[in-house]
């Protein structure tokens, strides 16, 4: 029996950079392997039993799909995860001895041709739109067209030859642009969010500040008005007379300006008189009445305005009822009525503090008294009518007595 040296050849030889005749300097030369009795183990093997070689070959060569080199595909190297079945490794021999790489080349050529088509598509569309595509071409145009075709061909060859380079560049560029867009969108979203939050806080702070300013201003004005009113109330009544005289001067100035000037009586005179009377009466309420609440102040103001509004409404209603238009004289009468009513309310409130509060009751009592007076007048007229009727009956009785005969009168006299 001859011991022949057969180096263990497998598909793993293609992964290493060693040749068939290389010797590992650390472990020494390869021992001889007896294929008949199997007494000699494979080189550098850790197996004690040659029968375990088929079971543990996956551990020996670390067969794993995740660590399989890319040169080994599923057709050339069959990998199993079970340890009992050894991998079925074999080589595929082609008739030509080389792999078929025609499909990837065609794919590369097609992908490289795509940018050229996309680049030429706008030019072709423009020429079609102008109706100048291959039409009326001269020598210069055909020369330019041939040069352009040459450039496109060279570009196609260049793109096909450097396919991996420019595809990686395009891929990196697209990924970079996508990341830029993503980062930009996230940044803009954060900016919008921060801006909205900032504006909301600004609006909130501004509203709180304005509310505090309004509150402080209102308190300050209320204190000023209260101090002024208390000071005037504690002073003599001559201040009230001075205010009334000032009011009268303003109203008469308006009258004279409207009479001899160019003021519109309907707007300037009536509205100014109402506003002046309301404002001065409001001030009078602060001076004369012994309370300083807004409730009584506004009640007096609305009562005065209500009375003046009633006068204006009645006047307007009467003019429209009788189909009359108010001329300058009518406006003077209306303004005079408002002026008289305002003065009357002013003096009445000055002499009797709190009179405006009692005015509704006074008006109701006045209306009731007026109606009672009308009723009494009606009763008196009825009594006068009854008396007149009795007088008529008396006259009728006297006429009946004159119609009696003389004989009957003698008999009655004897009886």
Curated annotation (Swiss-Prot):
Q: Name one GO cellular component term.
A: endoplasmic reticulum membrane
Q: Which residues form a coiled coil?
A: none
Could you tell me where the Basic and acidic residues compositional bias lies?
11-29
Recorded hits in Pfam families, A to Z, give: WTF
GO biological process terms held by the UniProt record? meiotic drive
Family stated for the protein in its record: Belongs to the WTF family.
Q: What is this protein called?
A: Meiotic driver wtf36
Give the species this sequence originates from.
Schizosaccharomyces pombe (Fission yeast)
Which gene is annotated as encoding this protein in its UniProt record?
A: wtf36
